[in-house]
């Protein structure tokens, strides 16, 4: 997209009756916990308020800063979220892939706002490097095919409205992870590469002969752990 248009979106102070919506997710890759899809809606003339917050992609902010911005964003914008728990992810992954699960949630939130507003632009962080294909698939799910769609890979780094959605999604997921820790103890971040997460899952599986409900059973990490248990049973039987 033209840089002038990007700058206008991030600094607009003229109201033309347009509604701006940003969409992003948190938690695509983790083996533990939900995937959260978040949307933020704002009148275009209020965009400078977001700009003044100094928003960035949620991954570039500290936990404390994200939590502070979460409150401020919620005061400025109409915020909505969809939390897809691990069991639901596993259920849907038997039929469709993760991109389509995400697209379905994105379109559900977008359609909510489209029902209320005809003059609307939707900015979305594309979950595919093929932005045009993603945009076409997203638009096909909308109740109004004429709304303006700006779908870009890493849009959370380029547009304040998407940065805001990124922060809402990330803080929401982080809060769920903290709730898990109160029940299970240290579980790490939930990502397969996190040593604390791997240790928790391995110990849990060996002690309970199965995965906790907070784990995504369709993930390779989970399948490998269950395979280890089955192989150990066979080994013991052979002995």
From Swiss-Prot:
Annotated catalysed reactions: Endonucleolytic cleavage to 5'-phosphomonoester
Enzyme type, top EC level: hydrolase
Keyword Nucleotide-binding: no
Record's subcellular location: Cytoplasm
Cofactor(s) required for function per UniProt: Mn(2+); Mg(2+)
Cofactor note as given: Manganese or magnesium. Binds 1 divalent metal ion per monomer in the absence of substrate. May bind a second metal ion after substrate binding.
Keywords, comma-separated and alphabetical: Cytoplasm, Endonuclease, Hydrolase, Manganese, Metal-binding, Nuclease
Function recorded in the entry: Endonuclease that specifically degrades the RNA of RNA-DNA hybrids.
Name of the protein in its database record: Ribonuclease HII
Organism: Methanococcus maripaludis (strain C7 / ATCC BAA-1331)
Gene from which the chain derives: rnhB
